[in-house]
Design a protein with these regions (language model features):
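Conserved glycine-rich cofactor-binding loop
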Residues: 14-15
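Conserved hydrophobic beta-strands of the Rossmann-like cofactor-binding core
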Residues: 7-10, 81-82
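Conserved glycine-rich Rossmann-like NAD(P)H-binding loop of the short-chain dehydrogenase/reductase
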Residues: 28-45
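Rossmann-fold cofactor-recognition segment
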Residues: 48-62
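A short, exposed helix-loop element centered on a Lys and neighboring polar residues
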Residues: 116-117
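Substrate-binding pocket helix/loop in short-chain dehydrogenase/reductase
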Residues: 92-93, 97-105
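Conserved NAD(P)H cofactor-binding loop of Rossmann-fold oxidoreductase domains
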Residues: 84-89
Length: 136
């Protein structure tokens, strides 16, 4: 991994949009930290691409922070984060299951918030991005 190589963290990297995004960035020469629940798929991707495997369930807030800390310790810095974790469970109106709907919201909404919370201090304090920094 070179000093000038761009580095990215992508969640949901084991399938769908997240996998396609991870593979595209890897092919373009970025060093990719890929996260998803399915470690075995991430490990297979790591064999064929410039992707490092960081298993993670985004529903767990503490694990999001620990995973990002581990990525920073190994990558030194991160230039970009893309949070693609998501799940979908189509139902008809008479099949609505509140427990399943809560899980979908935990992954699709709160999972993103957990990841944003994990990276917010890093990106707000990232010196060379000070001029791009937003306000909260």
């Amino acid at each position: 991994m070179s000093e000038n190589q761009k580095k990215i963290w992508i969640t949901g990297a084991s399938s769908g949009i997240g996998k396609a995004v991870a593979e595209k960035f890897a092919k373009e020469g970025w060093q990719v930290a890929g996260s998803a629940r399915r470690k075995e798929i991430l490990d297979d991707m790591a064999k064929n691409h410039n992707i490092s495997s960081y298993p993670l369930d985004v529903v767990n807030e503490e694990d999001c922070s620990k995973t990002f800390d581990k990525i920073i310790s190994e990558f030194t810095n991160i230039d970009l984060c893309i949070f693609c974790s998501g799940t979908y469970d189509p139902k008809k109106e008479k099949e609505i299951n509140l427990k399943q709907n809560r899980f979908v919201m935990d992954v699709n909404y709160f999972g993103v918030l957990n990841c944003v919370k994990a990276v917010e201090i890093y990106f707000c304090n990232y010196l060379h991005l000070q001029h791009l920094r937003g306000k909260m």
